Every structure is written in structure tokens, then in C-alpha cells.
């Protein structure tokens, strides 16, 4: 069927990729869904038709459901093919994503919003590394004092909820686009440049994410870089993050936070994610307490996908602390790294 995309963002021509993305850049931000489950993107029409198992998947039986897209340049149309494995798409629930975000202000500084009780699903979010604009299906976009509560958040192509970084045109995927310096230097620059863009306790952070059910997103359940300082993340159920293994890189976890300064993460239940909680850079005054983490590892015998990272319940990286990890139950093969 033909589809009309009314703005400049076409997820079926936009690729997932950027700084700290280690997998091949062959997946689109678009996706096809069958009965609320994302299909696996094929690189060719032949692969789509064959519908073979994708071995790195954590759910190989689901990986035979495929889709493929190409552009008809003569008609200026996006064409999508799908292999539903014999299911009739006119009788099943079949959807595609189009929106880049669902509830996220286009401007920064939109403070003190409460977002409560919504079911948010199926957005064409983009890869969200730390030295880039970090979008999600929901997010305050460099603001202060949001409450995101009692929501179901699922099936984002990349991130579910973003407490992340603003768009800085002079430091956005700069290594990928300009091929200078390094992604690590871009992160150092982001810390310094943030001071010129209002990164103070008076302006940014102090958010609350609570009692949300976050699942089946392919980069993170919750992501953040600098914008999540002084926040509380509590009583959330986060699971099945990055189980398709079609995306790979250094920004994948149930919760992935850079600069989780004075952030408390408590009483969260996190399982079946590539990683449970990853605090990267500046985990200063961070406390992880009373969380239940388990099965944050691939099924036994599953081959590693290209670009995939190691798995563990909690990972603290590039942080001089102090970071307090107390009263958690960690049952995965690797607990803390």
C-alpha cells in the first residue's frame, strides 16, 4: 500500500547509526509490526522472502518474520515488503512506525510537565549516543522537573524514554560526520559545552520516572546524557531490551545513563536486557538500591551479533564516584562490572 509521510523525516530512508554504533549501518529507523511485535529487517528482498532464522536473536523463532524496504524513485514512493509466515495481514494487526517521537517538545526548557497513564508505542526513534541529540518516544528535551509515571512504553526502534542531551549542531555525531577527533573527545566537549547551554541544577534535570512498564525497545528502555541529573527512577519494570540483536553499539542497556549525577535508581525490576543498568561517565553521587536484576544475558549458545557488547546486571564505567550500589538482587551470570 502507498503511504504518505507529511514531513521531512522518512524513517524508511533514515538509517540507524552514528557515534558509538558498532553494527553494520544497514537498518532503518522504520519498522513493521505484527500483533505488537517488531519484525526483523532484511537487507534484501530475497532475504525477506526466504524468512530464515537470524541466529543472534534471543527469540530465534520470531526472527523468521521479516520486512524489507526500498524506494521507487520514479514514483517517489516508499515500498515495503513483509513476510508474515502465512498469516493474513488483513486479519491480523499490522502497523508501521512513522513518528520520530510521541511526546517530546521540539523546544528546550519546557519545564514541570506531568505525563501520566499513557500507552506509548511504535516510534521511529534514532540512535542516541552521548554526544548527539538523544531522542526517545517520550522525553523532556533538556528541561526540568518532569514526572513520567504509570505509562506503558514499548516497541521503540531505539529508545523508550530519553532524559538526554539537547541538539548541539557543533557537536552532534561529530566523529561520524566529520571524521575528526574521537567520540570520546566529543563527550569531553559535551561536558564543557553544556555549561554554555544552561547545564545547571536550576535549569536541567530533577525528573521522576516511576511505575512505568518499558519493554521491547531495541537500544534502551531509558537513556540519558547530562539531562537526567538529580533525577529519581523508581518502581519501573524494564525488560526485553535489544533482544532482536539487529542494533549494536556502546549505548545499549535497560537503563543507560551518562552523567547520572545525584541520580537514584531504586526498586526497578530489570530483566532480559543486553545489560541491566549502565552508568557511564560521571556517576557521581549515584545510588542504585533495591533493584531486582536477572536474565540480563543472551540465551545459552546464542552467537554474538556484530557490534554487540558484553552483558551484566550493572556496569559502572568512567566514573570516579562516589557511586553507591546497595541492597540489590543480581542474578545474571555477571552481576557487576
Task: Give residue ranges: language-model regions.
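Right-handed parallel beta-helix
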Residues: 111-124, 144-158, 170-190, 201-219, ...
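Beta-rich catalytic cores
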Residues: 134, 218, 251, 310
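Predominantly extracellular/luminal carbohydrate-interaction, adhesion, and secreted-enzyme modules
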Residues: 136-138, 220, 253-257
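Extracellular polysaccharide-degrading/modifying enzymes targeting complex plant/algal/animal polysaccharides
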Residues: 1-2, 6-142, 147, 152-154, ...
